[in-house]
């Protein structure tokens, strides 16, 4: 509930009342001097019922409600305080009665006073009252003293409390009512009260407070009081008579039933006391004479049942005080460190491009400052927290402090009263953002605070625990660049303290304080009282990334670089002899800032010119050039690309193997499903039609009595033949197991990583050896080992079960030599120990130009690493060139043919991955033929590269994709046609520029034997004997109808020999070669 506190205006005019009443009204601020005097005054006025002294209350209501008070003030003669509400206004009217009722709210004064007894001293600090009982009325009043548009004279702002039992003493005696004035006042004033019944109050509830008013001496001045609404929380009591305050007639007081939880403003009271002292001393004599009459009137009115108060005439016209000039508002932008003239200018600045760019740059610097600092070397940076800039050295920081920009910001912050951090520099570490302290800067929207003093928003703090926060009418923050000011958060009760951005509004000093205001300027805006729990104001903590600079470290930073070449900087003067600029003859530059002279002499540009032109022995720090930095970045990028290439290659190889297994599984699944389908069709009557043989069609093309079916048979894929089943079964038996594949992948991956480390080791060794040589020659030299590649069956994916040997090719930048081979063999075990804890056996085979690596863990794998170089093939291609023989080979160069074979293996692997890997059934047939070459001696002379070319050409030349059985039959048909015989076109190597026959290593007899064996295998395929060609047992027949044995007397194949070779006994001539 917020009761109304109206603006009361007093005009002192002559009246027809007696001199005693005039003296009673002389107590301008209502300070009661003694209870007897107040009672006498009350008794005096209570004995004049016909003279119209008291106001008459319109209606006496036992229960009424407190309404929200409007902001508008009312001009009346006296302040009316209902007895039930017991809320005493800050006595803006002369209150000469009810001294006993109001003495508990403030310090009492003696009855007799002299002229010097009314000096107002500081009131004794009161202790916090104890918590009230259950039947105690609680008052929570909060006063906010801001600049008003009406007041001309300040008044006492202390809060006074009127006890319920003392209200009866404030009732005036019978007086003649004047309803015109009374009704005007009570109709405009809100009716406040309680919602309780009338039975809860005693007889004192019927009484009303009497404000005895006596016409005063005519005065042309009009005093206007601006009383602002207060917040009161009133709890009803069971019986008002039970709460009795205890007080004494002394300068101090103590209450036991009233709990005061408001905020005391002693500084404001001091200003008001000084304003009221002059008028109080003038009315000293009148107050002495009115004290006895007021005490008598209060004593008499306490037992009088009248409800009339005395009416006091007042002037009809009120003089309006002159309003002070409105202070200008200053809008400040923390990001750009500038102030704007008005809100429109400030709004346009926030929407401008300059502000947005600075804000974006600030956010970007917070995200990338740590990475940028790490790339700029290890130079320490000194940071100015006020301007939020970083300087590269102590001289630059000192120049910034003396500069106009910094001084302008300091002046602006001092004017606005903002905290100014210390000018001591902070060293910013490399991992710390340059804007480390910007996180605590204001980010809230601007808001104007139209107050003439410093005001803290402490509404969220219990006012009972905060006392002694005093403010002055004109106090400011006097801050300089050397003074540290702690930031005061506006919301102290919140868990997360934040400082909002505000608009600082200048204050005006009170018109009535006179010279006292100058004495109060030294009082701080916020004070902590020892009696109450003070609000702890947190200090701004420094960022964790920045550390204060000690004098020793600052001196070390300053002594890092000594200025040179003072004599070469000359002063340029004007006609008057005043120095207008400085000119450096070494650098051919000019500057007009005296602070920049010292920095220029220490700068890198000036020192380089000094070293070039004056002293070549001067030491200048070397910074990498842009070209060198780009070269280094290019090397790093290429290294990352190589690592990414090898990683992707491993993933592709793993994916390729998984795809092959998946395709085989899908093939077998599809084959079994279709085989079951055709078996079911064969068992059905009527040729396998589920609905009987097709009969005559009906009128609509549908057989009578049958559901409609699509016209024409559904296109079915050709089912796998028996040859396909045999080929896929054989392929499954020769495909490597999972353990073998994992072992191969493991040893190959470890070997590749170890060779990479060996290459790095050899490169570092070469750099250290050639460190004293020329930089250009060193930069252009390549690494000794350029890379390692997979070749052979490993790269082509043609591994068979039981294969333990894989091949790798190690490319060198120069021709591989025996010394290089031995160095690699020596370093490889060390690098293998770093990568894997397993043991490996390493042998150096000089004749094979290779290093053989054997694993010691089952399954034992062997890796053959062959050294080669592209230079060998390039020389081989220009053998007819005259200059080819001028380049001499190393004396211990490895075998040339082995290196050429390794290069050819690289080309073969690349061709196979591009042409044969994606061809259907090609890889499967090549595995079948490799197995045939290992089982049958006749086929062992067939070169693997020629066989791969033949299979790829046979399958790719078919008109349609071939199934495994058909593909194997087509390959045997090609060989049987005599394509490998002498005089045939042959098989040319597609990886060679010159025509080269891949079958050149075979003799004529070997060619004929393989052709004859292929023709015999083709005949076996024609008679469903493919299992003999594949070297496997016959598969069980899926259809029992076709599993009928012939009982003719023929020689059985169960004599213990291979069927493929046993058949050869019939015709000794054809099968001697198997």
Swiss-Prot record:
Annotated Low complexity bias: 365-377, 429-448
Region: Disordered, residue numbers: 120-139, 349-377, 417-452, 703-723, 760-781, 1040-1074
One cellular component term from this protein's GO annotations in UniProt: cytoplasm
Modified residues (Phosphoserine): 1054
Coiled-coil annotated residue ranges, if any: none
Subunit structure: Found in a cytoplasmic mRNP complex with STAU2. Does not interact with STAU1. Interacts with STAU2.
Identification of the protein by name: Zinc finger RNA-binding protein
Native source species: Mus musculus (Mouse)
Protein encoded by which gene: Zfr
């Amino acid at each position: 509930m917020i009761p109304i506190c109206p603006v009361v205006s007093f005009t002192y005019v002559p009246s027809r009342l007696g001199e005693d009443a005039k003296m009673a009204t002389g107590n301008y601020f209502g300070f009661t001097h003694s209870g007897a005097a107040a009672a006498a005054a009350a008794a005096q006025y209570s004995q004049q019922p016909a003279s119209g002294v008291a106001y008459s209350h319109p209606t006496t209501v036992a229960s009424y409600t407190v309404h929200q008070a409007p902001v508008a003030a009312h001009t009346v003669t006296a302040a009316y305080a209902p007895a039930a509400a017991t809320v005493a206004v800050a006595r803006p009217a002369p209150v000469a009665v009810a001294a006993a009722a109001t003495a508990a709210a403030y310090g009492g004064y003696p009855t007799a006073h002299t002229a010097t007894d009314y000096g107002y001293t500081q009131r004794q600090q009161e202790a916090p009252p104890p918590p009230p009982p259950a039947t105690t009325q609680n008052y929570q009043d909060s006063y906010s003293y801001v600049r008003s548009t009406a007041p001309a004279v300040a008044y006492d702002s202390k809060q006074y409390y009127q006890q319920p039992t003392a209200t009866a003493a404030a009732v005036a005696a019978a007086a003649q009512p004047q309803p015109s004035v009374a009704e005007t006042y009570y109709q405009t004033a809100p009716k406040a009260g309680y919602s309780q019944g009338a039975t809860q109050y005693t007889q004192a509830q019927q009484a009303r407070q009497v404000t005895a008013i006596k016409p005063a001496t005519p005065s042309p001045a009009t005093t206007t009081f601006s009383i602002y609404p207060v917040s009161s929380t009133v709890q009803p009591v069971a019986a008002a008579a039970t709460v009795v305050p205890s007080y004494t007639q002394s300068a101090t007081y103590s209450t036991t039933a009233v709990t005061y939880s408001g905020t005391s403003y002693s500084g404001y009271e001091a200003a008001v006391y000084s304003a009221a002292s002059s008028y109080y001393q003038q009315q000293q004599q009148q107050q002495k004479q009115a004290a006895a009459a007021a005490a008598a009137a209060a004593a008499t009115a306490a037992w009088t049942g009248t409800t009339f108060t005395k009416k006091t005439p007042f002037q009809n016209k009120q003089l309006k005080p002159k309003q002070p000039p409105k202070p200008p508002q200053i809008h400040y932008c923390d990001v750009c460190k500038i102030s704007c003239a008005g809100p429109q200018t400030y709004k346009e600045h926030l929407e401008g491009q300059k502000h947005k760019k600075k804000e974006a740059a600030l956010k970007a610097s917070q995200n990338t400052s740590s990475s940028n600092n790490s790339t700029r070397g290890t130079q320490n940076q000194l940071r100015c927290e006020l301007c939020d800039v970083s300087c590269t050295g102590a001289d630059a920081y000192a120049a910034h402090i003396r500069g106009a920009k910094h001084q302008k910001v300091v002046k602006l912050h001092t004017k606005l009263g903002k905290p100014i951090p210390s000018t001591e520099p902070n060293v910013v570490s490399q991992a710390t953002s340059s804007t480390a302290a910007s996180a605590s800067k204001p980010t809230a929207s601007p808001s104007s605070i139209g107050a003439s003093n410093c005001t803290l928003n402490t509404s969220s703090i219990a006012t009972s625990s905060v006392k002694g926060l005093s403010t002055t009418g004109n106090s400011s923050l006097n801050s300089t660049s050397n003074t540290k000011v702690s930031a005061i958060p506006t919301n102290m009760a919140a868990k997360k303290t934040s400082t909002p951005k505000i608009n600082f509004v200048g204050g005006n000093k009170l018109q009535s304080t006179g010279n006292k205001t100058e004495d109060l300027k030294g009082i701080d805006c916020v004070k902590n009282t020892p009696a109450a729990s003070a609000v702890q104001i947190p200090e701004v903590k420094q960022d964790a990334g920045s550390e204060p600079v000690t004098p020793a470290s600052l001196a070390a930073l300053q002594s890092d670089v000594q200025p040179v070449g003072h004599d070469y900087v000359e002063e340029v003067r004007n006609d008057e002899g005043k120095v207008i600029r400085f000119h450096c003859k070494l650098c051919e530059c000019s500057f007009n800032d005296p602070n920049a002279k010292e920095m220029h002499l220490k700068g890198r540009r000036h020192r380089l010119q000094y070293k070039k032109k004056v002293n070549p022995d001067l030491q200048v720090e070397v910074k990498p050039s842009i070209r060198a930095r780009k070269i280094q970045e290019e090397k790093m990028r290429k290294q990352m690309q190589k690592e990414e290439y090898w990683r992707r290659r491993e993933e592709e190889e793993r994916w390729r193997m998984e795809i092959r297994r998946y395709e085989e599984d899908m093939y077998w699944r599809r084959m079994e499903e279709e085989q079951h389908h055709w078996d079911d069709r064969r068992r059905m009557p009527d040729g396998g039609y589920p609905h009987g043989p097709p009969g005559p069609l009906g009128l609509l093309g549908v057989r009578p009595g049958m559901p409609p079916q699509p016209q024409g048979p559904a296109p079915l894929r050709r089912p796998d033949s028996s040859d396909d089943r045999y080929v896929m079964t054989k392929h499954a038996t020769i495909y490597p197991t999972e353990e073998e594949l994992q072992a191969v992948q493991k040893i190959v991956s470890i070997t590749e990583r170890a060779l990479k480390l060996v290459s790095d080791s050899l490169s570092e060794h070469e750099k250290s050896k050639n460190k004293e040589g020329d930089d250009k020659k060193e930069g252009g030299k390549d690494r000794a080992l350029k890379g390692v590649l997979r070749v052979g069956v490993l790269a082509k994916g043609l591994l068979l079960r039981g294969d333990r040997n894989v091949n790798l090719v190690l490319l060198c930048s120069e021709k591989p030599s025996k010394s290089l081979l031995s160095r690699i063999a020596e370093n490889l075990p060390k690098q293998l120990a770093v990568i894997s804890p397993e043991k490996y056996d390493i042998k150096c085979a000089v004749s094979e130009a290779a290093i053989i690596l054997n694993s010691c863990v089952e399954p034992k794998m062997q890796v053959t690493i062959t050294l080669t170089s592209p230079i060998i093939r390039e020389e081989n291609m220009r053998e007819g060139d005259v200059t080819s023989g001028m380049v001499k080979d190393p004396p211990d160069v490895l075998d040339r043919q082995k290196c050429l074979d390794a290069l050819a293996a690289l080309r073969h692997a690349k061709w196979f991955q591009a042409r044969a890997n994606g061809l259907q059934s090609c890889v499967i047939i090549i595995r079948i033929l490799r197995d045939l070459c290992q089982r049958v001696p006749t086929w062992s002379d067939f070169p693997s590269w020629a066989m791969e070319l033949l299979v790829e050409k046979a399958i790719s030349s078919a008109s349609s994709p071939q199934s495994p059985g058909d593909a194997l039959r087509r390959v045997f048909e090609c060989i049987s046609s005599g394509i490998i015989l002498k005089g045939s076109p042959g098989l040319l190597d597609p990886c060679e520029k010159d025509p080269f026959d891949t079958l050149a290593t075979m003799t004529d007899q070997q060619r004929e034997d393989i052709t004859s064996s292929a023709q015999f295998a083709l005949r076996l395929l024609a008679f469903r004997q493919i299992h003999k060609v594949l070297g496997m047992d016959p598969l069980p027949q899926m259809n029992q109808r076709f599993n009928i044995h012939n009982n003719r007397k023929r020689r059985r194949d169960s004599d213990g020999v291979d069927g493929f070779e046993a058949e050869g006994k019939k015709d000794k001539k054809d099968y001697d070669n198997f």
